[in-house]
Amino acid sequence: MENIAQADALLFGRVTYEMMEAAWRLSTRTVAMPDWTEPFARTIDAAKKYVVSSTLDHVDWNAELVRGDLETAVRELKQQPGRGVFTGGVTLPLALAELGLIDEYEFIVHPRVAGHGPRLFDGLSKRLDLTLVDRLELGSGAVALQYVPRAQRSTGNAVDS
């Protein structure tokens, strides 16, 4: 369940990258955060990041822009030695799921019904059956659920969502 800490890199779309940078970049933090967020903040701040964007001209925060064909770029990232790449957000994971490039899915379910907001995988062109492989109850009441596509049980150099 520690996919972000174990991943070799993070793969974000522009919106998620900008949101994560605003929230977790330690060198620009102006508001004190609760102590329990520090391990996550240090992990995300130090991680290598790849940003898929056709509108950004440059990125920093230990990041590199991904240009060109998404499938080719992600397959190249997955071929690199290591434990894999973690992704998050709404739009990019949908595109990766459509391409069959996600080896593991991790969903954090919070004990709150919002009634609005983006829907994950909205518009997915085909049904994707998943098998639960792990779960973790968090102190906040949230539950982390880890799945793999039903036809797949083990992973290597995964792109996790």
Which role does the model predict for each range below?
Residues 1-101, 111-161:
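Portal/gating segments that form or line small-molecule/metal binding sites
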Residues 104:
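Short, conserved catalytic or interaction motifs in soluble domains
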